[in-house]
A protein has these predicted regions:
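A short, well-structured juxtamembrane/interface segment
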Residues: 4-24
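Glycine-rich phosphate-binding loops that contact phosphosugars or nucleotide phosphates
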Residues: 26-136
Length: 136
């Protein structure tokens, strides 16, 4: 069962990668609230250290929505995270990014949630407190 979930997540990430490769991405924005934002810091860290081809930044979802980055547009990739998929600020930020032409992806644990309806690529991850490391 866990292998199927991992395979789905890998396929979703691969689809996002293929889409990103067809665009001239210049900016990557990592967007969420609270703990969901904190879980994206490894992505921010790796991109910041491993590439100088794109500008990478982390923005709180409410701030992103109320004061959108000037560089946000069709050369942007916006990576969001909402565990529930319903965090209002994150859903609003996703909608804004999508409307501005950015490629959007959101991590969530809830298929069919509100954030899925406003992003290009939902990516499901599975939060199982009883068995948090299913492949170990």
């Amino acid at each position: 069962m866990h292998e199927e979930k991992v395979a789905l997540t890998k396929n979703q990430i691969a689809a996002l990668r293929r889409a990103a490769e067809t665009r001239s991405i210049q900016d990557i924005f990592v967007v969420a609230c609270g703990g969901s934002l904190a879980t994206l810091y490894p992505i921010l860290y790796i991109l910041d250290r491993e590439t100088n081809a794109v500008h990478v930044s982390s923005v709180n979802a409410a701030e992103f929505f109320h004061n959108p980055p000037h560089r946000l547009g069709d050369h942007s990739l916006v990576i969001l995270n909402s565990q529930s998929g319903t965090t209002p600020e994150t859903v609003s930020a996703a909608r804004l990014a999508h409307e501005r032409g950015a490629l959007t992806a959101a991590f969530t644990t809830v298929p069919g949630s509100a954030i899925e309806t406003v992003v290009d690529f939902p990516i499901y991850y599975y939060d199982d407190p009883i068995n948090p490391y299913p492949l170990l």
